[in-house]
Design a protein with these regions (language model features):
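Nucleic-acid modification enzymes, centered on SAM-dependent nucleic-acid methyltransferases
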Residues: 1-192
Length: 192
């Protein structure tokens, strides 16, 4: 569902995903400089197949998401360094998804009656847990588990209570932007 290929698109830094297409197999490599591909494969939800050029309408794409036939693909690893963001291709080990038995997927249903401001039901997302990939849920649950362990090991004081509150707000902010619906803001090099 790529609308464009830039990971970083600032005046001083240009990094992009370069698709390498071999038949119906699509891999990505990370390159620096101007991206030669002017637009992505997603135009207002309508998808253009990069292999054959045929178009899948937004309604057909939504039906695929509702039928749970779509899948996620890890495209890049982004690391923070003292000189800014570093972009690289995932290693084979990083492609491995967390075991679903280690993930407690939320099963609460969303209020789908009035979805004017939150249009996930049209894409087959009616349960809160469906908003997250297994990798995102594993990360969030690891944070909260370790946060709870930390809370049990340190004697409560006003300072630690303030620290716990800060960490809880931080985890909440991470959860808001780290969903499958999140977008990468390439000119700010951050998640939106």
């Amino acid at each position: 569902l790529l609308k464009q290929f830039y990971l970083a698109n600032t005046s001083s830094k240009k990094v992009y995903l370069n698709p390498v297409i071999n038949g119906t197999d699509i891999q990505f490599e990370i390159k620096e400089g101007m991206c030669p591909i002017k637009s992505g494969w997603n135009n207002r939800g309508n998808m253009t197949c990069p292999c054959c050029g045929s178009i899948t309408t937004v309604n057909q794409v939504k039906l695929q998401f509702k039928a749970k036939t779509s899948k996620e693909v890890l495209l890049a690893i982004i690391s923070e360094t003292n000189r800014g963001k570093l972009y690289r291709s995932p290693t084979k080990n990083e492609y491995i998804k967390p075991q679903s038995k280690n993930i407690d997927k939320p099963t609460d249903r969303m209020a789908v009656e009035n979805n004017r401001n939150f249009n996930t039901p049209g894409w087959g997302i009616e349960i809160y847990g469906d908003m997250f990939s297994d990798r995102q849920l594993f990360m969030l649950q690891s944070f909260t588990k370790n946060f709870s362990l930390l809370k049990n090991k340190i004697e409560p004081t006003q300072y630690t209570q303030a620290l716990y509150t800060y960490l809880a707000i931080w985890i909440d902010r991470i959860a808001v932007v780290n969903t499958s619906l999140g977008r990468w803001h390439n000119s700010g090099e951050k998640i939106e």
